[in-house]
Amino acid sequence: MIQEQTMLTVADNSGARRVMCIKVLGGSHRRYAGVGDIIKITIKEAIPRGKVKKGDVLKAVVVRTRKGVRRPDGSVIRFDGNACVILNNNSEQPIGTRIFGPVTRELRTEKFMKIISLAPEVL
């Protein structure tokens, strides 16, 4: 469960290390975002010579949460931290060319197939 002010790690090579959620997209009073939801983020920590810089405001898709994801069979997949993949503001395609760490099968929609194909492991 990601809400405003939540700090997340970045699971791609866009150049950002830590980001903060500033808005959960999809509804006027939507409070939480889970795996597969798009959020608005600001870059809090970035590496030198990256594709993004500190202070940039972009969109991101949540790929891992500590809260986890509940499957129809009743199982829950939880992770050690909250992570996201940074997206282009217009096309909503990933900025980075590599994804680090596992992602869940819930991302397997038309919009996020690129993330699934780049990920080293799909749970």
From Swiss-Prot:
InterPro entries registered for this protein in UniProt: Ribosomal_uL14, Ribosomal_uL14_bac-type, Ribosomal_uL14_CS, Ribosomal_uL14_sf
GO molecular function, one term: structural constituent of ribosome
Family from the record: Belongs to the universal ribosomal protein uL14 family.
The gene coding this protein: rplN
GO cellular component, one term: cytosolic large ribosomal subunit
GO terms under biological process: translation
Name of protein: Large ribosomal subunit protein uL14
SMART domains for this protein: Ribosomal_L14 (SM01374)
Record keywords: Ribonucleoprotein, Ribosomal protein, RNA-binding, rRNA-binding
Function (record text): Binds to 23S rRNA. Forms part of two intersubunit bridges in the 70S ribosome.
Native species: Enterobacter sp. (strain 638)
Binding partners and assembly: Part of the 50S ribosomal subunit. Forms a cluster with proteins L3 and L19. In the 70S ribosome, L14 and L19 interact and together make contacts with the 16S rRNA in bridges B5 and B8.
Keyword DNA repair listed: no
